[in-house]
Amino acid sequence: MMVIQKSILACCVGWITMIPPCGAHPHNWVTMRSEFVANDEGELVAINQTWRFDFFFSAILIAETVNEWQQPLPKALEFEARRMVQNLAPYQYFSVLLVNEREFQLPAPDRYALQVAKSEGQEFLELTMHFQMTQRPVLAGSTVSWSVYDPTYYIAYSHEHADNVTIRHASNLSCSQQLKLPKLTEELIAYAFSLDQTERDTDGLGRAFAEKILIACERQGEVR
């Protein structure tokens, strides 16, 4: 029983070190909320993300975090959040922002936190990250695409619906968002579910399964 528990634990927390230890895709599920902040000139000045991990992953990581860091839970989660963000940095925080087909890199988040959130009597871990944009693309009149995904598809990310994407903007802007689901073939789905722990070359699979958020903003009185 102890061997099984350790195997499950390694599978669930392996993404923290970015070395996927086990197969069958996906292993964990993340529900996201994304907020885009535009200034009076219609420039994107900040992106705020919230990732809610599934109940099973959350329960195991809460226990493992306290055990590893040997600290009370709030302090242990601070240490774990720092490690998560550091490990996500080389992968651009699994985030892809395209404005008029040009990719904009996210800077390191100026604030982040890993906290326990309660919903319907259950506890979930939520990672929040706040990015102040160093490059400020203009949203007004632009074609904007936003995706968050694990390239290997070990973790499935989803906003679930467009209402989990919000856009804070000045009154002179009018913005809308649309959730676009991927077009998947039966062959691709079968391949993803056939993978086992020996598979390592799965880069690109996450992109194929990734949803896209399409954002359109217009200045009031302007028509494209």
Residue ranges of each PLM-predicted region?
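N-terminal secretory signal peptides that target proteins for export/translocation
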Residues: M1-I4
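Bacterial N-terminal signal peptides
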Residues: K6-I19
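Early extracytoplasmic/domain-onset interaction patches
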Residues: P26-A59
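Short solvent-exposed loop/turn micro-motifs enriched in small/polar/acidic residues
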Residues: W29, L88-P90, A208
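Mature, soluble, non-transmembrane domains
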Residues: N100-R224
